[in-house]
Amino acid sequence: MYQFDRKEYEKRMEWYQDARFGMFIHWGLYSIPARGEWVRSVEEIPEEEYLPFMKEFDARDYNPKQWAKEAKAAGMKYVVLTAKHHDGFCLFDSKYTDYKVTNTPAGRDLIKEYVEALREEGLKVGIYFTLLDWHHPDYPHYGDRIHPMRNHKECGNENRDFSRYTEYLYNQVEEICTNYGQIDIIWFDFSYDDMRGEKWGATKLINMVRSLQPQVIIDNRLEASGEGRGSLYECDPTPYHGDFVSPEQIIPPEGICDKEGNPMVWEACFTMNNNWGYCANDHYYKPASMLIKKLGECVSKGGNMILNVGPDAKGKFPKESSAILAEIGCWMDKNHDSIYGCVPAENIPKPDYGRITRNGNKYYVHIYENTLGPLPLLGFDKDKIVKVRALDDGHEVPISNAWMHSDYPDIAFVDLGPDPVLPDPVDYVLEVEMAE
């Protein structure tokens, strides 16, 4: 029986908090209609109209080795793929359903190939697994808030046995935990209304998961969702507590602490465009420059960032996504020390020009916008500054002695040189080493 132990928990979370940056991948049958992963619910598509997509799912361009290489090149340390999303279709070979990838033209277990590809690149393996299942006959249909058949009285729930569904859920999660070696992250999704906690058989489920995968990290969505924080926040963890909070499509304004004011582990998940699953008409991509800054913001507040890619119907990353990943990777190549293993810079105020992260006695000043005149290092004890260097190439950045800041004798200023345009106009990083 699993019981929360603070020391074991903190040890389990070490690699994850050091990693700071991961990739989410949403891929499934919904990639064929290409109108987002919730298409069946949003458009209330009947089962008989959705099932034919199985005949088209051939995974022709599925190349998890390429996925892994792009994630690694972008500076990501872990990847989470949807083994099953809410439509109930499985990318793995489950013995408990025929609604699976081995019964499509793809004809093979895609999760097996995925985990092998990640391990070859030294990436941590994450599996997303939904708690919902719009395909299963015992999952509530009519009257459920989000089921595709929610408005169809003929799909009533009189003969549905939810205990059969939770047994099915348990069995499939057991397959995931048994058949694919070490799983580093299980990303459950999601609780809503009264569908939370023990409604899912959560204690039994987590006891099984933690017995088979004792070091696995689990999100908080057995008891919460993109909103809500779970029992760790209440300082009274249930057996199925989340290891991290999972804010969705938002970065917390001030990071996240529990009720007693202790920092919590969290991960902001968001999309590159406006959909998780492939959407052919959604070309509203966030620029790489924005996402680089958001990564720095997450780390400066004590969180991780997991950035989504939605492969197309054939399994290929959209060209826009690949270009964004490559651009982020160029920045990470030079500046990863300001991300990996970093934490908030306590007692240092957020500067007007950017963000600050810290690793030990080294502070990383992320400059998004240059200042007029020398750049102030507010909150730094100027007598304890050992040196200041540009992180990208290591050159010395001198402490300024200019006359224009003589009215501020207690504040350290640095001289970035005569050019008002930053060497990196997106996020130019200084490494400030302080005396220990």
PLM feature spans:
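Mature catalytic domains of secreted/periplasmic carbohydrate-active enzymes
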Residues: M1-E436
